[in-house]
């Protein structure tokens, strides 16, 4: 089993109920999963990581999704106890439509590394998308 989100950037802003099908979940997948599945006891933190990282990599047949010597450093650093309300105006990605607007959640993504390079940083509440184009796998 996997937990996935839709990483499809779009600049077309319109009300949620008028937007194309599908939800852009780049900024909401981790906090909503922590809030609704981990904090409620449905999943352990390890099971969440397996379903969002290890299992998708295994299904896709790519050598990713684990932290181990010699492996590629694709890492998301999360503060699982930080609380905030989802505000799509603060999203670093182009997609802004979300059914979670205003939802109170736990779990703030602080950094994202792809191929060992920081591509996203939220340092002291200042979100910075360092690279729009993610390095190739």
Predicted feature descriptions by range:
Residues 1-3:
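Conserved small/polar residues in nucleotide/adenosyl-binding loops
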């Amino acid at each position: 089993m996997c937990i996935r989100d839709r990483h499809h950037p779009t600049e077309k802003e319109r009300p949620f109920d008028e937007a194309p099908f599908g939800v852009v979940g780049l900024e909401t997948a981790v906090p909503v999963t922590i809030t609704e599945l981990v904090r409620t006891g449905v999943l352990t933190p390890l099971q969440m990581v397996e379903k969002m990282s290890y299992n998708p990599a295994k299904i896709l047949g790519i050598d990713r999704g684990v932290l181990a010597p010699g492996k590629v450093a694709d890492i998301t650093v999360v503060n699982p106890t930080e609380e905030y309300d989802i505000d799509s105006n603060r999203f670093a990605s182009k997609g802004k439509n979300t059914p979670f607007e205003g939802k109170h959640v736990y779990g703030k993504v602080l950094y994202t590394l792809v191929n060992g390079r920081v591509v996203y940083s939220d340092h002291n509440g200042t979100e910075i998308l360092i690279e729009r184009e993610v390095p190739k796998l």
